[in-house]
Amino acid sequence: MRLLLDTHIWIWSDLEPWRLTSDVTRILSDTENELWLSPVSVWELIVHVEKKRVTLEKDVLTWIATSKQDLSLREAPMSWAVAEELRFVVLRHRDPADRFLVATARVQDLTLVTADRTLMEIDGVRILPNC
């Protein structure tokens, strides 16, 4: 499976793994699956750390580099096709990061791993729910 991690799933996988369901934990641990991360999630984490919403035991850039290596993360490209797909992403809330994740999952044919129920209601994207 080709899986795009929502930002909170990526963070929880290291900082709060108990928040992941056993199914999601098993699937993320399966080395046959590809784990993808959007640059938007990297930006979102940096913002959360700067605003003190997330606390890390090390520098944010070091944490990101370690996480990318530990999880064998692939970079999901922010392409023109993704930007163009954004116009079709309608969410109840206006979180631009979520819109980018949905558009990326659609364009790159990835399954979005999320606990966000709003994203679970979106048509045209495969979801692996963490609930």
Identify the residue ranges that each predicted region occupies.
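Short, well-structured N-terminal submotif of metal-dependent ribonuclease cores
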Residues: 1-37, 51-66, 108, 122, ...
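Residue-level signal for well-ordered alpha-helical positions
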Residues: 16-17, 48, 89, 125
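Short, conserved active-site loop motifs that form the nucleotide-linked donor/cofactor pocket
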Residues: 33, 73, 125
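Phosphate/NTP-binding elements of NTP-utilizing enzymes
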Residues: 45
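Active-site neighborhoods of divalent-metal-dependent phosphate/nucleic-acid chemistry enzymes
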Residues: 57, 61, 69-117
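Short loop/helix-cap segments at secondary-structure boundaries that form the rim of catalytic
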Residues: 118-125
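Basic, glycine-rich
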Residues: 127-129
